[in-house]
Swiss-Prot record:
<comment type="function">
    <text>Part of the Tol-Pal system, which plays a role in outer membrane invagination during cell division and is important for maintaining outer membrane integrity.</text>
</comment>
<protein>
    <recommendedName>
        <fullName>Tol-Pal system protein TolB</fullName>
    </recommendedName>
</protein>
<keyword id="KW-0574">Periplasm</keyword>
<comment type="subunit">
    <text>The Tol-Pal system is composed of five core proteins: the inner membrane proteins TolA, TolQ and TolR, the periplasmic protein TolB and the outer membrane protein Pal. They form a network linking the inner and outer membranes and the peptidoglycan layer.</text>
</comment>
<dbReference type="InterPro" id="IPR011659">
    <property type="entry name" value="PD40"/>
</dbReference>
<feature type="region of interest" description="Disordered">
    <location>
        <begin position="411"/>
        <end position="431"/>
    </location>
</feature>
<dbReference type="InterPro" id="IPR014167">
    <property type="entry name" value="Tol-Pal_TolB"/>
</dbReference>
<dbReference type="InterPro" id="IPR007195">
    <property type="entry name" value="TolB_N"/>
</dbReference>
<comment type="similarity">
    <text>Belongs to the TolB family.</text>
</comment>
<feature type="signal peptide">
    <location>
        <begin position="1"/>
        <end position="26"/>
    </location>
</feature>
<dbReference type="Pfam" id="PF07676">
    <property type="entry name" value="PD40"/>
</dbReference>
<keyword id="KW-0132">Cell division</keyword>
<dbReference type="InterPro" id="IPR011042">
    <property type="entry name" value="6-blade_b-propeller_TolB-like"/>
</dbReference>
<dbReference type="GO" id="GO:0017038">
    <property type="term" value="P:protein import"/>
</dbReference>
<keyword id="KW-0131">Cell cycle</keyword>
<dbReference type="GO" id="GO:0051301">
    <property type="term" value="P:cell division"/>
</dbReference>
<keyword id="KW-0732">Signal</keyword>
């Protein structure tokens, strides 16, 4: 299999483009297939005044915590418990819960909701605080995700990612859709719909834009989609292939792979489409750039050594320092992604005839496969570095999967009924 084929420079098919901003009919569903070896027992009581609301905040919180693989939900019964109630923490500890959550959702005169909750440590018999959130019918889900994030951080010491978003491409029949959803696959919206392939979505650091590659003009072109306005604009339409956009940490620049002069090389372009600059100067294929979180390095895939491996160079390009090989486990490694703390490298390695997700410690060089799947591609770290989202195959279908970065639990499968889903990208923390 050639590097160009593996990296997804697909053959073109026919037809027209439809830009869209509506709700998605084909929606990703989450299947929880395993949990971590150590789980935190927590009881979340039904929030008061939830009956009849368009979204049940309590259910969203419980589902988020279960989906993380880090918590086990202790049965809290059916009786609502508001945050103002007097709580017998000893009784909840006796039921096996090391933490307890109480809350309420109250409709205000302006039609909005006030969502209040409090988190208790039943072991230390103390309050861990809470939040008071304002929401409307469409943002009640977000309120639930924010509550789960608060719980995750208070109890585990790591910022939660339930209120982040995903982007991915769903293919149903001959139609491709770039969708944006909550981290649980719900609340999906269509950013772009086309009968031409859409690949390589990449979130801006602000979480307000997604860069991607569309084949709608019979060749791959890089676009940026502004999510708040729904507008999009072309960033790179150079001669040949325009592919693999990756944002700089400051959001001002995109690294891209262009075949402008023949072999694909790494360039940078300003986010407004100007200032094109070549970074690599090899006679090989250099592609799939990705910035380190400090902005000092660009990691990329190259076959300059005879087979695809991952290299890194100064962000200013090879003129500022020679590229150095990073991966040495296996003979075929692609798709570099650096963790938010800059300590880990996720990539795809050809292993035993399949392709598996590996994680490498960038300080020691130690690398390990962390999945039990064999057709892995397109890894993307969660904003807290605790999970990796990737595309794979399960039951003969193209699906997404999320796995802890340390491989401590089996992947959770995200699939779509009647279609396939690929090209995942996990968004940053919400501003």
């Amino acid at each position: 299999m050639s590097l160009m084929t593996k990296l997804g420079f697909r053959a073109l098919v026919a037809s027209c483009l439809i830009a869209a901003g509506g709700a998605a009919n084909a929606q990703v569903n989450v299947l929880i297939t395993g949990v971590g070896s150590t789980q935190f027992p927590i009881a979340t009581a039904n929030f008061a005044n939830e009956a009849g609301l368009p979204q049940q905040v309590t259910s969203i919180v419980r589902a988020d915590l279960a989906r993380s693989g880090k918590f086990t939900n202790i049965d809290a019964g059916s009786t609502p418990v508001p945050e103002t109630a007097s709580v017998d923490l000893g009784a909840w500890k006796a039921k096996g819960a090391n933490a307890f959550v109480a809350g309420s959702v109250n409709r205000e005169a302006n039609g909005q909701y006030k969502v209040n909750f409090i988190l208790y440590d039943t072991v230390k018999q103390q309050s861990l605080g809470g939040l008071s959130l304002t929401a409307n019918d469409t943002t009640l889900r977000t309120a639930g995700h924010k509550i789960a994030d608060y719980i995750y951080q208070k109890l585990l010491g790591v910022r939660g990612v339930f209120a982040t978003r995903l982007s991915y491409v769903i293919k149903t029949g001959n139609r491709y859709q770039l969708q944006i959803s909550d981290s649980d696959g719900q609340n999906a919206r269509i950013a772009l719909s086309s009968t031409e392939p859409i690949i390589s979505p990449a979130w801006s650091p602000s979480g307000t834009k997604v860069a991607y590659v569309s084949f709608e003009r019979k060749k791959p072109i890089v676009y940026i989609h502004d999510l708040p306005t729904g507008r999009r604009y072309m960033v790179s339409d150079q001669k040949g292939n325009n592919s693999a956009p990756a944002w700089s940490p400051d959001g001002n620049t995109l690294a891209v792979a262009l075949s402008l002069t023949g072999n694909t090389q790494i360039y940078t372009v300003n986010a407004n489409g100007g200032g094109l600059r070549r970074l690599t100067q090899s006679s090989s294929i250099d592609t799939e750039p990705f910035y380190s979180p400090d902005g000092h390095w660009i990691y990329f895939t190259s076959d300059r050594g005879g087979a695809p491996q991952i290299y890194r160079m100064p962000a200013q390009g090879e003129s500022a320092g020679a590229a150095q090989r990073v991966t040495f486990t296996g003979s075929y490694n692609t798709s570099p992604r650096v963790s938010p703390d800059g300590k880990l490298l996720a990539y795809i390695s050809r292993t035993g005839g399949g392709f598996k997700l590996y994680v490498q410690d960038l300080q020691t060089g130690a690398a390990n496969a962390i999945t039990n799947t064999n057709r892995d591609e397109s890894p993307s770290f969660a904003a807290n570095g605790q999970y990796i989202l990737y595309a794979t195959q399960s039951g003969g279908r193209n699906v997404l999967a999320a796995v802890p970065t340390d491989g401590s639990a089996p992947p959770q499968i995200l699939s779509v009924q009647g279609g396939s889903v690929r090209e995942p990208s996990w968004g940053p923390f919400m501003q």
